[in-house]
Each structure stands twice: as C-alpha cells, then as structure tokens.
Amino acid sequence: HKEMNLADFLALKGRLSDILTHVVIKKSKGRSFFKKVKTTALDFAVINVAIASIDGNYRVAIGSRPSVASLALKTMDSVNNKKKLSKEEVLKAAEIASEELSYASTNAASAEYRKALVKAYVKRGLEEVSKE
C-alpha cells in the first residue's frame, strides 16, 4: 500500500488505479465541522462540506458536487491567518466557496441547489469552527 497526503489525492481527480482503503487523520488541536446532506439516511450525499481550523489556518473541502472532492482554495485564502472571523468575512467566504467550484445536476439534486447548499453550510461551518 502507499500513502499520500490529501492534496495529492484530490489532485488525482478520479484517475485512480487503486482502491482507497484507509484515511489517516493526525490528531491535532483545532476545531472542525462536517456536514453530509442527503435525502434519506441511506442515500449517497447530495453535497459534503468539511472545514477545519488549526492554529488560525482553515481547510475547506467540498465533495459530492458530483465530482471528486476539492479543496476550496480561494475560500481558504480569504479566511486564513485571521484571528477571528467577522460576520462579513464569513458571508464573503461562503459566497466565494459557492462560486469557485463547479456543480452538476443529477437525479438527486440540481447544480443550483448544490451551490446554495455549499453557501449555507460553509457559512455555518465557518461560524462553528471560528467560535472561541
């Protein structure tokens, strides 16, 4: 088996020849948020939003757009290295997150709905992880 970091894995964009069997998350002090939006308990996700804040640095990942999960790099740039996020900065970051990635429509959800979900849950997630 081989190990790789998350950024390298996400850069593969579905070009995998192996099966992902493990995810290793090193323990560190920080706050995190995860939301899986689905229609029923057993459904595949319509959208996934994951946010972590460690030492003033934020990581924002969006999955099930439907596509391979991606880091929201512009969103991360807009909030990183700030002591405390203002309400306006959170709203701006949520807007950036909804705009910087592409979304597609499927039977489960439209692209517009996914985009709206990302905006709402990035806002909620940033509010949650930036609490003191």
Where are these regions (language model features)?
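C-terminal structural segment of proteins
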Residues: 1-132
